[in-house]
């Protein structure tokens, strides 16, 4: 085979791994976290001390954001991309504001596989 064909196959394998590793949760390529048994797959220095292999990052997390006080804000903000958020959005109190707010999304894991959340 030519070097280009081998290179193209390697790129396809990396893309395939990137797409299908998003729903693995805590289960890495070596199966469930088995401590030292998944050692070479977890990265250098992690397997032999009891940390198993790591799966792809599914974008799940837990956090709270609270803002209180006066917020004199002038300008515009634009947020684009994927922000996996599960929770509620609340705005209360008097505010002299002009503009529009659009909040849309879907509850649950973004990949729909129901993996375990990271704490």
UniProtKB/Swiss-Prot annotation:
Region Left arm: start-end pairs: 22-55
Keywords noted in UniProt: Repeat, Signal
GO MF term list: structural constituent of egg chorion
One Pfam family linked to the record: Chorion_1
GO cellular component: egg chorion
Residues passing through the membrane, by range: none
Location of the region described as Central domain in the Swiss-Prot/TrEMBL record: 56-103
GO biological process, one term: chorion-containing eggshell formation
Intrachain S-S bonds: none
Signal peptide start-end: 1-21
Domain of life according to the entry: Eukaryota
Residue span of region Right arm: 104-119
Chaperone in keyword set: no
Family membership noted in the UniProt record: Belongs to the chorion protein family.
Entry function: This protein is one of many from the eggshell of the silk moth.
Protein name: Chorion class CA protein ERA.3
Organism: Bombyx mori (Silk moth)
Record gene name: ERA.3
């Amino acid at each position: 085979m030519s070097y280009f064909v081998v290179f193209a196959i390697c790129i396809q394998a990396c893309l395939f791994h990137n797409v299908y590793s998003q729903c693995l949760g805590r289960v890495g390529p070596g199966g469930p976290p088995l401590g030292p048994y998944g050692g070479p797959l977890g990265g250098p220095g992690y397997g032999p001390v009891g940390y198993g292999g790591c799966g792809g990052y599914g974008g799940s997390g837990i956090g709270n954001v609270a803002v209180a006080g006066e917020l004199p804000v002038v300008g515009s903000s634009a947020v684009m991309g994927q922000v996996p958020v599960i929770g509620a959005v609340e705005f209360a109190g008097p505010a002299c504001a002009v503009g529009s707010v659009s909040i849309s999304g879907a509850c649950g894991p973004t990949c729909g596989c129901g993996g375990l959340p990271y704490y």
